[in-house]
């Protein structure tokens, strides 16, 4: 079986290629005193949150359930209590960051925070079905 995989991979027909490019990009960004904000998008029930958690766990060995948030209050608490260079996964950030609620004070507070908190060295992954569901001000500061 391995011979067949090698045969097709050498000809550019592999189903997927494994590369450390993504991990190297994240590590390089962190090494240059930057943080990571990322949107994890895809159809509902397809594993966006699980993937985000796996990324966070690989990047931060201390990542745990307290770093998974579902609303603004949990997000604020996680940001205040987590260590430097912590990773936070915000599942379905519709509450507080919805593109339809751009005029609400809570939305303004969160987007301003996301635009200015790099010095705290916190990293956030947002899991949601479409990037357009999150406020534009938050989208533009996301790395991916």
Predicted regions and their residues:
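N-terminal pre-Walker A segment at the start of P-loop NTPase domains
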Residues: 1-33
